């Protein structure tokens, strides 16, 4: 059976990066098969949790091909691994603890997502204040708040923070927390079972605070949108509070009817931007403090400079660093940080100028020939300008290379980039919204193709 396990590992090696394989698979031990369960020896509990969450969906089908009758995977902390490893001199990294899921009546809010655990910076200060003000019932603005940002920047954290705050401070309030997908599924189920009154009671008369995430899911779902409009109207009429989240301004979400756009856009709109360098440093320091692990300042600054995407990427890189340090029983150093961050960056989808041009043309409904032409038509000129800017932001191509792709001179490319950068400085300007919307489309498209 050792040969079969070797074949499983070889297949995994072909589908994973070298860093992922070395860290998570090469350290696995084949312990045998019991009652249809493939028993694997792991380094520690963190190793087990990572395998369950990230690799099991890929590992189980491969194992079933090579081990007849295997239906499940079972993980055990192998003897002599974490417990018996020699101690490193000095303060070594501790085992990463996983909080148990809090069992409670009503919506399940992540206990880690609180206002105290939210790192506030210039990128999210307004959204934080809006969510906190709503939780405190400060009547400084409309009773509706809409948080918008790209994925991984803190919308869900703030939404759960409101829920946790209300549950602890105002338990008498009836709080409903759902994603729009859950809202839609409950509505469809109620329709099929002739129980729409119960559905309406839950979200209208039986609700004091509605927390509704991922509005973009409703794109094109006309009947669900109409029901949500009725729900929002009744809640507003009764003086109740609503917090919604989305990945774009309501009016920029495609196939969202004008009534719903109006209801959502009529409240307080609170965008969240990507964290700046200073905020990224604070996020890393807060996360390492929460995990009770000491990370040298030079490593903190290196990660903050290297990982410039969303908060989730930053925390994921830090967790990977702590995991590797923990599993290998080695201190956290700058060299280890370089290795882990490079492994993570290698996994991110690469975006090309051609992909950017394709999305730009589709959005502005122009041809590639028009985009590259000398046309000064307003629509074409705007598309070209944004395309050049996004190429500068998302690729490693030089200005000269970008100019060649758009059939423009170096100075024309530089002018276009500067023009868009000026427009991005306007808080609610049309150009800024257009660029943010196309950036989201570009990132989503590349992630789905990777």
UniProtKB/Swiss-Prot annotation:
The listed locations are: Cytoplasm
Q: Which CDD domains match?
A: AAA, Bac_DnaA_C
Positions with a binding annotation for ATP: 152, 154-156
- Where are the residues of the annotated region Domain IV, binds dsDNA? 326-450
- GO CC term, one of those recorded: cytoplasm
GO molecular function annotations of the record: ATP binding; DNA replication origin binding; lipid binding
**Cystine residue pairs:** none
Renumbered residue ranges of the record's region Domain III, AAA+ region? 108-325
- Write out the entry's keywords from A to Z: ATP-binding, Cytoplasm, DNA replication, DNA-binding, Lipid-binding, Nucleotide-binding
According to the record, the residues making up region (Domain II) are: 70-107
- SMART domains, per database record: Bac_DnaA_C
* Keyword field contains DNA-binding: yes
- Region annotation (Domain I, interacts with DnaA modulators) maps to 1-70
Report whether DNA-binding shows up as a keyword of the record: yes
UniProt xrefs under InterPro entries: Chromosome_initiator_DnaA (IPR001957), Chromosome_initiator_DnaA-like (IPR020591), DnaA_C (IPR013159), DnaA_dom (IPR013317), DnaA_N_dom (IPR024633), DnaA_N_sf (IPR038454), P-loop_NTPase (IPR027417), Trp_repressor/repl_initiator (IPR010921)
| Biological processes per GO annotation | DNA replication initiation; regulation of DNA replication
Q: Quote the HAMAP family the UniProt record gives.
A: DnaA_bact (MF_00377)
Tell me the NCBIfam families matching this sequence: DnaA
Similarity-based family? Belongs to the DnaA family.
Give a short account of what the protein does. Answer: Plays an essential role in the initiation and regulation of chromosomal replication. ATP-DnaA binds to the origin of replication (oriC) to initiate formation of the DNA replication initiation complex once per cell cycle. Binds the DnaA box (a 9 base pair repeat at the origin) and separates the double-stranded (ds)DNA. Forms a right-handed helical filament on oriC DNA; dsDNA binds to the exterior of the filament while single-stranded (ss)DNA is stabiized in the filament's interior.
Task: Provide the domain comment.
Answer: Domain I is involved in oligomerization and binding regulators, domain II is flexibile and of varying length in different bacteria, domain III forms the AAA+ region, while domain IV binds dsDNA.
* Name of protein: Chromosomal replication initiator protein DnaA
Origin organism is Syntrophobacter fumaroxidans (strain DSM 10017 / MPOB)
Read off the lineage from the record: Bacteria, Pseudomonadati, Thermodesulfobacteriota, Syntrophobacteria, Syntrophobacterales
Gene for this chain: dnaA
């Amino acid at each position: 059976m050792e040969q079969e396990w070797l074949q499983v590992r070889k297949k995994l090696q072909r589908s994973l990066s070298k860093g992922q394989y070395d860290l998570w698979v090469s350290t696995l031990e084949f312990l045998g098969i019991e009652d249809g369960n493939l028993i694997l020896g792991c380094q520690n509990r963190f190793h087990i949790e990572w395998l369950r969450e990230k690799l099991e969906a890929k590992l189980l089908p491969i194992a079933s091909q090579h081990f007849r009758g295997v239906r499940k995977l079972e993980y055990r902390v192998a003897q002599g691994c974490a417990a018996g490893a020699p101690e490193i001199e000095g303060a070594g990294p501790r085992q990463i603890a996983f909080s148990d899921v809090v069992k409670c009546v009503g919506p399940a809010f992540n206990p880690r997502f609180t206002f105290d655990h939210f790192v506030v910076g210039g990128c999210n200060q307004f959204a934080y204040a809006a969510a906190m003000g709503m939780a405190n019932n400060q009547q400084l603005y409309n009773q509706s708040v809409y948080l918008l940002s790209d994925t991984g920047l803190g919308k869900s954290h703030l939404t759960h923070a409101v829920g946790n705050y209300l549950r602890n401070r105002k338990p008498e309030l009836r709080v409903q927390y759902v994603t729009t997908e859950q809202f839609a599924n409950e509505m469809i189920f109620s329709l099929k079972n002739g129980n729409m009154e119960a559905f309406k009671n839950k979200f209208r008369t039986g609700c004091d605070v509605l927390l509704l995430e991922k509005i973009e899911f409703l794109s094109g779902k006309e009947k669900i949108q109409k029901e949500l409009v009725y729900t929002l109207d009744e809640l507003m009429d009764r003086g109740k509070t609503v917090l919604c989240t989305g990945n774009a301004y309501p009016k920029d979400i495609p196939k969202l009817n004008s009534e719903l756009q109006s209801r959502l856009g009529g409240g307080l709109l609170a965008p969240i931007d990507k964290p700046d360098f200073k905020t990224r440093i604070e996020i890393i320091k807060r996360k390492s403090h929460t995990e009770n692990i000491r990370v040298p300042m030079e490593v903190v600054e290196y990660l903050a400079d290297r990982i410039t995407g969303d908060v989730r990427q930053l925390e994921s890189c830090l967790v990977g660093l702590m995991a590797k340090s923990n599993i290998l029983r080695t201190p956290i150093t700058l060299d280890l940080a370089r290795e882990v961050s490079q492994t993570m960056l290698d996994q991110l989808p690469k975006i090309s100028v051609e992909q950017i041009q394709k999305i730009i043309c589709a959005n502005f409904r122009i041809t590639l020939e028009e985009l590259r032409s000398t046309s000064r038509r307003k629509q074409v000129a705007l598309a070209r300008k944004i395309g050049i800017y996004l190429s500068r932001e998302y690729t490693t191509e030089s200005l000269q290379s970008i100019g060649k792709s758009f059939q423009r001179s170096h100075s024309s490319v530089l002018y276009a980039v500067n023009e868009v950068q000026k427009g991005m400085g306007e808080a609610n300007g049309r150009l800024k919204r257009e660029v943010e919307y196309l950036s989201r489309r570009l990132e989503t498209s590349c992630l789905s193709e990777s």
